Regions:
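ATP-dependent helicase/translocase motor core
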Residues: 1-189
Length: 189
């Protein structure tokens, strides 16, 4: 489904397969049979959804917090495109800040910052969130992210079941997508 960058140039066939990967964006992506709602941008690799984005602009009076509200309250997590592990990450992107989550669960969805620092530095050539477009969303880096950083961890929690009158292990999966500062540290090492 996806061919990652070869570790060496010794296998020309693998090189050719890697070059055939297609990272595409879809603007105003309609996702439901029940309404006409759309997501500002969907990113796919070889037709597989990997990232969804709500894009907000201060010139229209909106910021990344408006995108977060949209994900929490206007996007039904039961829609097939939003089911857990269907996408790797959901971004809310403004001119000044970026937030992300890996699981939509309605109003309880937890977003984390995906910024360079507490405040993104001023960019004399454009938006403060340029790093998302200029660095992170480059095709080779997206593939590197998927291959080396994104993973699923199974967590086990002890819960008491009153019907059975005993403590049980409750397992749940957590999709790990690194935040910007984590990626930045690894890249600098």
């Amino acid at each position: 489904l996806v061919y990652f960058q070869p570790k060496s140039g010794l296998n020309p066939e693998h090189q050719e397969l890697f070059k055939k990967n297609r990272l595409i964006t879809v603007r105003q992506l309609k996702y439901s049979k029940h309404n006409e709602n759309s997501i500002d941008m969907g990113i796919f690799i070889n037709g597989i959804p990997i990232m969804m984005m709500e894009l907000k602009n201060t010139l229209t009076g909106q910021d990344h917090n408006d995108g977060i509200r949209q994900w929490k309250f206007d996007r039904d997590p039961k829609e097939p495109l939003f089911k857990f592990k269907r996408n790797l990450v959901y971004f809310s992107v403004g001119n000044e800040k970026v937030s992300m989550t890996t699981r939509l669960i309605g109003s309880k969805t937890r977003f984390l910052p995906f910024n360079k620092d507490i405040e993104n530095p001023v960019n004399k050539r454009g938006h403060k969130t340029h790093y998302l477009w200029d660095d992170i969303l480059q095709p080779n880096f997206v593939l590197d992210l998927i291959e080396n950083y994104v993973h699923i961890r199974t967590e086990t929690e002890k819960v008491y079941d009153p019907q059975r009158e005993k403590v049980l292990d409750k397992k749940s999966d957590v999709l790990i997508f690194p935040r910007y500062h984590q990626l930045n540290v690894i890249r600098r090492l």
